A protein has these predicted regions:
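A short, proline-enriched helix->beta-strand linker immediately N-terminal to the Walker B motif
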Residues: 450-454
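Membrane-water interface segments at the C-terminal ends of transmembrane alpha-helices
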Residues: 5-38, 48-159, 183, 187-208, ...
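Catalytic Walker B motif of ABC-type/P-loop ATPase nucleotide-binding domains
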Residues: 456-460
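Conserved ABC ATPase signature
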Residues: 431-435, 439
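Conserved beta-strand-loop-alpha-helix hinge in the C-terminal portion
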Residues: 510-541
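Conserved ABC ATPase "signature" region
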Residues: 175, 410-427
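Helical segment within the ABC ATPase nucleotide-binding domain
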Residues: 470-482
Length: 550
């Protein structure tokens, strides 16, 4: 790849101010290294005051960083998940306020709060507790100035990553606590390490708040920055030596955090390799089933057992999306929601799954026994399958079973069976990043199988797949979920034909037409008019290919 293509979109003149910025930041450190008397470095470092200040700084910074993690991590999660309301904006403003305050002002605020005559400190004096001008005050000052950096950095990383994995985990039956420990925390490890390094570095360099609130008592509150400031007038060589130590520690932290992030992301791509020859293709898998592979009950291998399943009636309006519908999806059959982009198909699916709050829209699950209202077990397959990237395919499929309280051993056995039933035997230990899009979708399908849902929601799961992978996925859905309620969003007539679907055509957020796919196609071909043009545009050529395969 040539430089011309590598840097496409960046004007050449940008390099000049960028180089100036680098030099502006780098030259002072070079000057610092040149100015130091390296011969005297060991002697200066061995002096009591310097080693004492360094040890105190490291101890207090570790304590303040731990405090940042303990209270800052929950705060970052709250801020990241909060909706954009006035109170969330106020909360973020208060969190970031210490970042823009002069450190001396921060120290003064701490002093009038926790000092002997402070708002809280005066009451602590009654119990003989004195905080100001102690080592505890140093830790509090460092925490006060570094906590906003920790929270802001971590919150930004969380908001950038998004919470799709958490949404899926919740839909698979995970409690909020299990979701936090099994999904959120593992995925935020690189951001947590980077934020921790940033907080530690900020605490290590704190000066103004410390000297105002804690003073400068040797061995008690005199940290490395304070010692550097005092030595600047007494011994320039000592001040320079301590400065280099400070820079070195910060450099190790930043470099270590970056290296750890790279290692962690590379670990996501690691996994036990498998023999590709053992993994059936979609065509081979379909051939096996066409030969009548079955279990002792006569059901296709991996097919879910027959159970009562509900239909659903959804009615109401969603004014902001111009939706006004009253329609019913029958139980035990495949319903295909079709129409142009913006017709409201995915919106209705989001309402049914609970991902979208629509107060003016209601849906009622109608069970065969006449009962209504009971929430069925629902599984969702999306266009881009949301698998947990830090887990193997086996762990992904076993996840909902573990959430249901099933033992680890039994969950693993059932997960292996589900993966084998969708043609992924031999890939159990691979991670999602190591498999193709079609294999990822089949993994999501296997995860849906172990949940044994009564309702399966499909949001264009075949759209991003190649022809063979899409055909294989259709066949798997048709075979495994026979007799279950399947509601599918699609633009392809071929999908509806392969799954023998009842089609509901939406236009502009309203019901345009519905019926069995064969009936609608026959009507569209025989009486084509403007109202049917949307249906015809979805691909009669694709339909002909599907009919040709029957």
């Amino acid at each position: 790849m040539t430089n011309k293509h590598r840097y496409a979109g960046i004007p050449r003149w940008i390099s000049l101010p960028a180089a100036c910025a680098v030099l502006f930041l780098l030259v002072p450190f070079i000057a610092l290294l040149i100015r130091i008397d390296w011969v005297q470095f060991p002697h200066l470092f061995s002096q009591a005051l310097s080693s004492q200040a360094l040890a105190l700084s490291l101890r207090t910074c570790i304590a303040s960083t731990l405090a940042c993690i303990i209270v800052g991590l929950p705060l970052a999660l709250v801020c990241a998940r909060a909706r954009d309301t006035w109170w969330s904006r106020v909360l973020r403003s208060m969190v970031t306020l210490p970042m823009v305050l002069p450190p001396v002002v921060a120290g003064l605020a701490l002093l009038i709060t926790w000092g002997r005559r402070g708002l809280i400190g005066a009451y602590l004096q009654i119990f003989g507790i004195n905080i100001a001008f102690t080592t505890v005050a140093v830790v509090m000052a460092q925490t006060f100035v570094s906590l906003p950096f920790f929270v802001s950095s971590l919150e930004g990383a969380l908001r950038t990553r998004g919470f799709n994995e958490e949404r899926v985990a919740s839909g698979l039956g995970a409690s909020p606590s299990r979701t936090l420990w099994s999904v959120t925390l593992p995925l935020m490890i690189p951001a947590l390490v980077s934020s921790t390094a940033l907080a530690f570095s900020r605490a290590l360099g704190e000066f103004g708040a410390t000297i105002t609130f804690a003073g400068s008592l040797a061995g008690v509150t005199r940290t490395l920055p304070l010692e550097i400031y005092l030595q600047r007038e007494e011994s320039t060589d000592m001040a320079l030596m301590l400065s280099v130590i400070l820079v070195f520690v910060a450099l190790v932290l930043v470099g270590g955090a970056s290296a750890f992030s790279q290692w962690w992301y590379s670990r996501l791509l690691s996994g036990t390799s498998a023999d590709e020859a053992k993994v059936p293709t979609a065509s081979r898998l379909a051939t096996e089933h066409s030969r009548g592979l079955g279990n002792k009950d006569g059901e296709a291998q991996g097919q879910l057992p027959r159970v009562p399943v509900p239909g659903v009636r959804i009615a109401g309006t969603l004014p902001e999306r111009h939706i006004n519908v009253d329609l019913t999806c029958q139980g035990g059959v495949v319903t295909a929601l079709m129409g142009h982009n913006g017709a409201g198909k995915s919106t209705l699916l989001s309402v049914l799954s609970g991902a979208l709050d629509a107060p003016q829209m209601t849906y009622t699950w109608e069970w065969p026994d006449g009962a209504s209202g009971r929430q069925p077990k629902i599984a969702i397959l999306e266009q881009k399958p949301v698998l947990f990237p830090h887990m193997s395919l086996l762990a992904n499929v076993a996840f909902p079973l573990r959430c249901a309280g099933i033992s680890s051993a039994e969950a693993e056995v059932r997960a292996r069976e589900a993966l084998e039933s969708v043609g992924l035997a031999g890939l159990e230990q691979r991670r999602p990043a190591q498999v193709s899009g079609g294999q990822a979708q089949r993994t999501a399908l296997a995860r849906a199988l172990v949940v044994a849902p009564e309702v399966l929601l499909l949001d264009e799961p075949m759209a991003a797949l190649d022809v063979e992978a899409a055909r294989g996925l259709r066949e798997l859905i048709a075979q495994r979920f026979l007799g279950r309620t399947v509601i599918m969003v699609t633009h392809q007539i071929e999908d509806a034909a392969a799954l023998d679907a009842h089609i509901i055509v939406l236009k502009g957020g309203r019901l345009l037409r519905e019926g069995l796919w064969r009936e609608l196609i026959n009507q569209s071909i025989s009486h084509a008019d403007e109202s049917d043009s949307a249906l015809l545009a979805m691909g009669l050529s694709a339909l002909e290919r599907a009919l040709g395969q029957e």
